[in-house]
Amino acid sequence: MKTFEELGVSPEIRRAIEEMGYACPMPVQEEVIPYLLGENNDVVALAQTGTGKTAAFGLPLIQQINVNNRIPQSLILCPTRELCLQIAGDLNDYSKYIDGLRVLPVYGGSSIESQIRALKRGVHIIVATPGRLLDLMERKTVSLSTIQNVVMDEADEMLNMGFTDSINAILADVPQERNTLLFSATMSPEIARISKKIPAQCKGNHHRTQK
């Protein structure tokens, strides 16, 4: 088993995750992190909640952010407000020792005006539910033209909740020259159809191993 250092994780991030109790990489992290730290790499993974997938995509996304350029560089789509807040909280914890990195959770049921103000101040990573992000796009208060990485977390749940059209509209607004990361607990026909569009270099099946 490799260490986070051997996977290429930066000292600042390693310091933060060690304080969080991360001793060694989980299997999905060991597979995914090196790919995402490379260039032009897509990922499709069957990974249930509790496999460590948030760190698998979160650590390399954070490491690749140019904090001096306060524009959206990574987009994470997820099905619920609760997961949106959880992922954003984890990313803030991982980036504890990276000065100036800004993560914005975007979800329905909260003030859209405050989210618009935060976008105007500048953010690096957007964690969003599809419906609210599409609302912001229609208001022309968010630009996805600088996004380099798109993560679809719990993609099967998003499709089950009827977000297919919203996701398609969002992806159509993101540059084609991007990395796409799809994480799903199941391989439904719709997920299989989407995954075929992703020329993934890293595909894996990871079951629940920790909470």
Model-found features: residue ranges?
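Conserved pre-motif I regulatory segment
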Residues: 1-46
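Interdomain coupling/hinge region of P-loop NTPase helicase/AAA+ cores
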Residues: 7, 75, 104-106, 115, ...
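Conserved nucleic-acid-binding Ia/Ib motif block in the N-terminal RecA-like helicase ATPase lobe
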Residues: 11-19, 70-138, 146-149, 192-196, ...
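Hydrophobic/aromatic position at a conserved helix-loop-beta junction
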Residues: 37-38, 120, 199
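The conserved Walker
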Residues: 47-51
